[in-house]
Amino acid sequence: MVTVISLGGSIVAPDKVDEDFLKNFLSLMREFLEKDEKRRFILVIGGGSPARIWQQAYRNICPKAVNEQADWIGIMATRLNAQLVRAIMGDWCVQDLVIDPTKVEPFIGRVLVASGWKPGFSTDHDAVLLAERFKADYVINLSNIEQVYTDDPKKNSEAKPIDKISWQDFLKLTGEEWIPGKNVPFDPVASRHAAKIGLKVICAAGKNLDNLRKILLGESFLGTIIS
C-alpha cells in the first residue's frame, strides 16, 4: 500500500523548523511502518516560511518580478525542507530526494521523499503525479487549515467548513490559475489533474497527528474530501 502525503511547508517550517512536530511525525510514520510491512509512504514537502520570505524579498526588490523566478525561489525552499525530512527518515528512506516526479526510479524502500520540481508545478502537483505513478488511491494534503471553507474564514466570519466537495465545485472556489505563493487549500493546476485521473484528495490539519492517524486507519476524521 502506497500512501502519498503532501506535507505543507507551513507545518514543517512555519517560521523556523518545528522540531517537535517533526519528531512526532517521525514517530507516527515509524508506528505504521513497523505495524504493516506492506505500508509505504511518499512524502512531498512544501516550502513554508522560507519560500514566502524569499519570494516576498524578490518582489520587494524587483517591482517587475517574474513569476518564474519567484517559483524557482520557492522550489529551492522545498528542497531544503525535503532534504531535512529525508535525513530524519534514516534507513526508511534509501533513495535520493525526488526532484522530478516524472523521472522516478522504482520505489525500493519504505519511504520516498520529494520536493518541488520546476516553475508552474507546485508540490501539490508533484504529489498528484507521484500518486498517479505509484497507483495510490488518494493524497493526504496536510496544511495549516482543518478543512476547506466556502470562503477565507479569516476574512469572512460566515465562511462554512466543507466535509466533501467535487473537483468542479472546488475549482470554482479557488480559481484555475497557479500563482507562486498563492494561498489555497490545494493548487488549482494539481486539482485539474487529480480530477482528470479520478484521484481523491483529503485536506486536513497537519499539526493534528491524532487526526492523521485516524485517516491512515480509515476511521472517521476531521477534514475535507475532494473527489
Regions found by a protein language model. Give the residues of each.
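C-terminal catalytic "cap/lid" subdomain
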Residues: 1-227
